[in-house]
Amino acid sequence: GSCAVVTGMGTVNADNPRLNARLTEPIVQPLRVIIDSKGQLSSKAALFDVDGSVLVASAGPRRDKSDAFDSRTESITLPDGSGRVDLAALIDELGRRRCNEVLIEAGAGLAGAFAAAGLIDELLIYLAPDLLGSGGRGMFALPEVVSLEHRLRFEVNQVKQLGRDLRVSLRAERWKA
C-alpha cells in the first residue's frame, strides 16, 4: 500500500473522505496529506474521525485560528509564490519522511497540477464500461497542448479486469527502461 495519500480541499469539500485504508487485516494507515492552499480545512472534517496522522500543507496561515487541529495533525507551509502549495517541495518533504509511494486521490485540478509539474510516475485508472455524456468530469485539468511534442506520455504497464471494470496501469515514459 501507499505510505501517504494526498488530496485537496476540492475533494474534502465535495466528498468529506476519511482517506483511510479499510481492510480486514490490521495495517499501518497511510499518512493523510491535505493540500489546503488557503488554510480552510476544518477540524470537523471526516478525516479527523478515524485514527492516523494528518499532514496539512498550505501556502500561508490558517484563516480560522480558533479551529485547532488535534495532536495527530501537523501543519507545514510550502508556498510556491503564486498562492498555491509547492507540489514538488511537498513530494520532497514526503521523501524526507521516507514516504516513497504516494497515492494522489484528487479531482481534475490537483491531479492536473501534479501531472503538469511532472510529478506522476504511474497512473492507476479504474474504468467502468459506462458513458456519462458531456457532463462527466475529466480526470486532469491541464493546459491545452499546442503541439504533440509537449504532450504527457505514458506507457501501458498493465490492464486487469475487475468485475465489469478495468484497472489500467500507465507508467510515465521518462521511466521507460
What are these regions (language model features)?
Residues 1-100, 109-112:
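Active-site ligand-binding patch in enzyme domains
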Residues 117-154:
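Flexible, gly/pro- and Lys/Arg-enriched active-site loops
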Residues 15, 19, 43-44, 135-136, ...:
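Glycine-rich, flexible loop/turn motifs
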